[in-house]
Amino acid sequence: MAKHISVKGVVQGVGFRPFVYGLATRLDLHGWVCNTSGGVEILVDGQSSSLEEFIQFLSLEKPPLAKIDSIQVDEAPCDSSSNFEIHESQAVEGAYQPISPDMAICPDCERELFDPKDKRYLYPFINCTHCGPRFTIIKDIPYDRPSTTMANFPMCDHCQAEYTDPLNRRFHAQPIACPECGPFVELRETHSQFPTSDPRISSIEIRTSAILKARRLLREGYIVAIKGLGGFHLACDASNPYTVAELRDRKGRFDKPFAVMAANITTIASVCELQKEEQNLLTSREKPIVLLTKKKQNGWQAYHVSELVAPNLDNIGVMLPYTPLHHLLLNQTDPILAREPVPPILVMTSGNFSEEPIATDNTDALQRLSPLADAFLLHNRDIHIRSDDSVVRVDKSNIMYLRRSRGYAPYPVPLPFEVKPTLAVGGELKNTFCLTRDHYAFLSHHIGDVENVETQESFEQGIAHLSHIFRVEPEIIVYDLHPNYFTTEYAKRSKLDIPHIGVQHHHAHIASCMADNGLDNRRVIGLSFDGTGYGTDGAIWGGEALLASYADFERFAHLEYLPLPGGDAATRSPWRIAAGYAYTLGIDFDDLPFLQNIDKQALRILRQQVEKKLNSPLTSSMGRLFDAVASFIGIRNEVTYEAQAAVEMEVLSKPFVSIAKPYPYVIEETKNGRMIRLRELLSAILQDVRASESVGMIGARFHRTIAEIAIDICRGARELTDLNEVALSGGVWQNQILLDHVRDGLRQDNFVAYFHQQVPSNDGGLALGQAVIANYARAEQSELISEHRRNGSK
């Protein structure tokens, strides 16, 4: 009997059919393989021993980009053919399958890229079944060239021969291209167009003219917009302080760190501390931005990298070239490219104005980015869906995702339980959305802060695209409780004939961590520390200890409620938070140095706001407490990006953490659970400020105190409930000092501590938690659903 085999997982666009063909041919089997909308279907016939080997080798020898979730084998009638064939793809109504993210250029393609004898020498769109664009060019499944943005480029005879040769690694590589038939680059200045490459020009010198010109402009201090895999970057010489300052001014990004791209790993090792795990991430096929520690002596200055790239920080986001085009821009050794030397480290930041989505379309980029860039390095391969660079950090040999996008999305998060087709829309900041079906949670690429029309449109386009690709017709829509979030409004105006479920922000964080770690529906102690989240009482939460499962939660403890004078304005002015806290707690602070440059009239107005409760919402936010302390001790009164004050305090605190002792603190029993009082803690901090204790030591003592409070709260919860598992989630846990001390302390106290493994702990992972909660809480939410329907029918 023959075998019919169904393979599910990421098995399209990764060279799986050519692999199956080669394996079957090697084992002298006959039959066929084809893509369907749901995966890969195989019929094989031959000797029984060979069939057994074939099934075994499907998993053991699969292509590097393939991820197999399941293999189903059934008996089938004998196949009458005498050879093995690749059949045309078949669309199956309602079927779907995960698709591969875009992947960095593979070693084989990189070698060919710089081989003068190769047809694709210095060709910026070289790729094969093991690398290149996937997610950003796919319009539909099954994954075939007509369903991608490469449909506009008919293959030449040479590429067609490779595409149809089962022994070639470009066999059925859908984005296959060469200089004769594929995309090409061109360089334009803001007001003129340079002679540039043409797809049918054989001269290497002419074909590379745009890249050579771009290298010269970068060396001379200009800012160049570069079209990449998932959108545009803005690039400039990282060693030129004038250019970096100009880029900051044009982009309106005054302090937030820029990422850089370095020519090679040796260059990175010269300027940053580099551990083995970090090097593995940098050179992985995903090639994310990796946060690395700056070398303290000689290294950071070796290439004269400007301090303006990442001011007041001890680390920097670094990545290696991940597309052929990036390699051509940064290569230091090729004889043709060497005619225009280029700095070995370039600033490589998102191609947008701050808070806007990155540009993807040539026409849009030329209009929108003209005030930012002096020149544009364009290409004519369309980007169907944008995808920002992913940002990660090594956390005790594991990956901490700060932003999960290119290289990782839309790989699904496997769930240990089945879920209904669900759309979870996430939060307002660092937005991702989540689609679920079966045992998968498809967390989207990074959308960003959905506070402007452009990002809102990107959000809606992303939902439409992924819903279509994964054939998800939601039966549940889930949103954050905050009534003024765009995502909440979007969810509430969508499809009134299905359940609409609101989920509390910090409950979603804890559920996200649980799902990320593959936990079933059981209660855990959840420490959800972040900057903001709408509470069930209408206050702004953020320093929360919950007793939570997927189905429900109970608030066990929280930070004391204190006012935010000016509301959102306070998040940009930590001095307002500090002063508001001190006024409310009756702490004398008029003599403190941080007030020296604060207008007295502004202080009087702030005091009136607090006393009269005018635009001063109450908060239990841990993030705002970090901001207040950073202001109290003189680090920063104003911020230009989220968590700036807290991050700078962490940097200054690191040298003192090992010797710092916690401040006194009080946890008070109240009728609504335990409350962490702040008067004693803040008074002790101000006493150290008056005693001229170093800023770093005060910051370190504060970090140690919060860690002790967190562990103390967990002990109290365990005594009452016998719960022993703790989930840590929320953006504050990206603070490495706090995470290390709490996680280690919990484990020493025999707790089981969980932190995120596959998705960010910040709001970039929020939608995952929303989705799983909605699936478990349907019965509990029936009253909310009925109310929504009643309101919707009016």
Where in this protein do the model-derived segments appear?
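Glycine-rich phosphate-binding/hydrolytic loop that grips phosphoryl groups
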Residues: 506-529, 533-535, 574-583, 703, ...
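Conserved phosphate-binding catalytic cores of ATP/NTP-utilizing and phosphoryl-transfer enzymes
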Residues: 269-275, 328-329, 358-363, 389-390, ...
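Active-site histidine-anchored catalytic micro-motif
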Residues: 514, 519-581, 588-591, 611, ...
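Conserved phosphate-binding/catalytic loops in two-lobed NTP-binding clefts
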Residues: 480, 497-509, 724-729, 736, ...
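A contiguous, well-structured pocket-lining segment that forms one wall/lid of small-molecule binding clefts
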Residues: 175, 182-184, 427-457, 461-465, ...
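Internal gly/pro-rich beta-alpha loop/helix module
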Residues: 146-147, 162, 334-419, 619
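Intrinsically disordered, low-complexity, mixed-charge
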Residues: 1-175, 179, 184-186
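A phosphate-binding glycine/aspartate-rich beta-alpha loop in the early core of alpha/beta enzymes
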Residues: 75, 231-298
